[in-house]
């Protein structure tokens, strides 16, 4: 290390391509020697061309700042000398290296033959769980100051500090991990080999505590599993006794705690439902401390009954929040340990045995190699093996499918020293008082003979407004072109490096007959060709029936009316495809018996290959069964539909089926088998009644307890609701004018001081058009415009960017109507563009309406309207999440005042402070807020 010299470079430029005439406007460097920064260099450069406005806005570097500076040629020799004999380090190396190399060459200098290190790549490897790898994100994660992002001197400084953190992290890795990283390093962008050799030599004879060996790599030494401890026999497990002595303790544990009557009411209601073996629905608004409100009675009941309580959520985010934020508070309120565990489905957990096999496969795919490197480092840190802890590249997600735990993993992955992650998670769950899971696993477990969750009769369903949807998705079926294509690609051909070629070589080595592989290859090619033709036909079929819709995503409902001559051509295609897949399965079964007979007891690498081949073939069989059910096995109590990417590939098709009334199945297969299920959410009622939700969930025959807790917030003082009088309806003006008006009102609200505006849409197509209207003006105003599905990143990343921005507008659809929290100043205004009615063309919704009609009910009153009111309440609930929050709601849909049903939406508002305003009144309000 003492002899290593690293030069960290950052450049600001007029654009992205030096070959197209873009120029450097600032260059900065920090020199690192002996583990510390020893020198700094920074120069503004005259590009001899105008700096574009957006670059000036991004960097803060203006034409005036560089007009009297020297051109790059004047500093070229100094830069050359700086880099001579050093590593070239940069954040996104190709960008900075490309510009420096080009400018040096123009100035008559050849870039020194130096090795390169990319801190984006290295950060991904050594910090595999970080949320993002931009300089600002890394600075935040590593708690480094980054005062002026997009200034070369500030960026180079923070890149240097990040690089020092990377070196230190590499130095601390155990010897086996470093050895495996060394083997992969030839595929990295960074020239890491010599550095890894140095760290390997340092660690060769060092036994670093806290790790254990699994085959060729190291894993973190697992923590001891907690054992249930017998409680004090004199302790009273009744909620009243607990409540009397713990209010003071709660106030000490929770900053800003105020006595919450609603929380205490909820505790008593949950405790009574458990004690009386009853089901219950509890509507708990923001601010009452809902999670604590059910965790305390759940912990008391689990201790008293000596059986776990299962807590199920819809989102993984809430699972983690319960375990890390709320549970520690609860644990501190008892004189004995309250144990808890998160348990997810098998596919969330890494199978160590599979990883060992895949790690040693030769792989030229960059994302796959990067993922292997990330996993090697992560295994020295993780206690759970849960993929949710990782930030994998897109190709890494495909690799994970090969590495995830499955039913065969247990018999393959047993080790003398290391328990598999999934077995460990199950063991912890079996010994816990509270088990936190998700709706999907809960429903899977109920329908399976092979139980994953511990036996329990007592459940809490949080985010219960999603429970019916989760059941519908779980009980439904789906077949896509991409799914079949991925399965076929994994098997491959005898010419490609897929499973088929490897298995033929394996059969040859073991003197087994290989003729079946040639026939299999022929039929696999037939299946690929038939699937291409079939899904292209489905795509064309849907496009012909939706010729006027200018949407990217087209949806077509399959029913008896649609089954004409063209439809019969599709069913013939589906039948042919299923017949070919069935024949493939028959050919495979002949091979399977040979494998069973001759490949048992072989080396683990051989067994792994055979297992993966069998899984892939079984995957085709399962796909065939699903396709058959979708086309030939659906019945009247299901909705079947097709979705296509109209502007995408000609076979970009997905076919779905979901039950219309999952509540009936929930009643028979879940609620009837449980002692007590408490369902809770902030939105379970319509017009103050639980009846809609009771019917939807199949609870009518169980006569559940219900409780609606009043909000602790004084909404009249904290929430202003405004309805613009001059906003015209889309029916009166048409969509183009409605889009323009929507953009105009967003711009009006953006004039407030430090605007943080969430705009909720019901259509992504409309969102895109409004974004197009806003884009130019928002860019000029300096307000950050974020749009779901347009500005890049997942909803989670958009949320984070929005939260950390001083001034921002976020345009969102479905995801942002619920389940996102923006406390305090993170959100000032929520704008609702249209009341959130489901599209009447959506097949599942249309089928539910048709079913209601057949039962003699009004589908609008019994299906569409209650669903829309619940979603509306969720959207309104984004604004005030904690005590002290204030904000404004703008509703642009005039139907809330003009339609007869508008009263239900007005009644759903938690405030009476509702005003209709002219544009001038609205402008005056915004101006007043700004002062």
UniProtKB/Swiss-Prot annotation:
EC top class, as a word: hydrolase
Gene knockout outcome: Cells are marginally sensitive to methyl methanesulfonate (MMS) and sensitive to H2O2.
Domain Helicase ATP-binding span(s) in chain numbering: 250-510
Chain residues that bind ATP: 284-291
Gene this chain is encoded by: dinG
Motif (DEAH box): 462-465
Protein name (record): 3'-5' exonuclease DinG
Family under the similarity heading: Belongs to the helicase family. DinG subfamily. Type 2 sub-subfamily.
PANTHER family on file: DNA REPAIR DEAD HELICASE RAD3/XP-D SUBFAMILY MEMBER, REGULATOR OF TELOMERE ELONGATION HELICASE 1
Keyword flag Nuclease: yes
EC number(s) stated in the UniProt entry for this protein: 3.1.-.-
GO MF, one annotated term: DNA helicase activity
SUPFAM superfamilies given in the database record: P-loop containing nucleoside triphosphate hydrolases, Ribonuclease H-like
All copies of domain Helicase C-terminal, residue ranges: 741-897
PROSITE patterns xref list: HELICASE_ATP_BIND_2, HELICASE_CTER
Role played: 3'-5' exonuclease.
Gene3D superfamilies, per database record: P-loop containing nucleotide triphosphate hydrolases (3.40.50.300), Ribonuclease H-like superfamily/Ribonuclease H (3.30.420.10)
A single cellular component GO annotation: cytoplasm
UniProt cross-references to SMART domains, sorted A to Z: DEXDc, EXOIII, HELICc2
Keyword Signal: no
Organism: Bacillus subtilis (strain 168)
Biological process according to GO: DNA replication
Domain Exonuclease: 7-162
